């Protein structure tokens, strides 16, 4: 009982000023998870190993103030694997020219992070609470819809202006 209370005091009973430590620890845990996953899944490829920590950081941003550090580590691990697999798929199978891996790194890992905040932010999993998976799912879906709409409109604008120039 006392260990459980200590853990609750460490995480749940914090003021906003005290949250900075939790955010810093969660950021580091996600970086470690992303690095390890990219190292394992990317077979020690330097490009993957360098982007693994970024994948973890991008993913944990949505929930760094509500997750337990173990949840942040898991979020980073999953993001590292997502980045390696999606980057390889984009480059090798789909032949899409995304040399820096912006779409898998920021797009897919960001979507995972939005959903992970709704999972690992729950009090039942050691998080701070105040979030729900459904709210995160809806918010992430709306963010993706807005990004796709904006990207499509800009593509159409550039495509028609290129046709007029030729």
Task: Annotate each language-model stretch with its function.
Residues 127-145:
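Structural signal for the N-terminal portions of transmembrane helices
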Residues 19-30, 71-77:
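Structural signature of hydrophobic alpha-helical transmembrane segments
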Residues 47-54:
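Cytoplasmic-side transmembrane-helix entry/capping segments in multi-pass membrane proteins
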Residues 12-18, 62-70:
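Helix-coil boundary and interhelical linker segments in multi-pass alpha-helical membrane proteins
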Residues 69-74, 90-100:
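A cytosolic-side transmembrane-helix exit/cap motif
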Residues 1-7, 11, 159-166:
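Single conserved hydrophobic/aromatic residue that forms the stacking wall/gate
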Residues 19-24, 49, 96-104:
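The feature identifies polytopic integral membrane transport proteins across all domains of life
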Residues 30-39, 43, 56-60, 64, ...:
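Transmembrane alpha-helical segments of multi-pass membrane transport proteins and ion-pumping complexes
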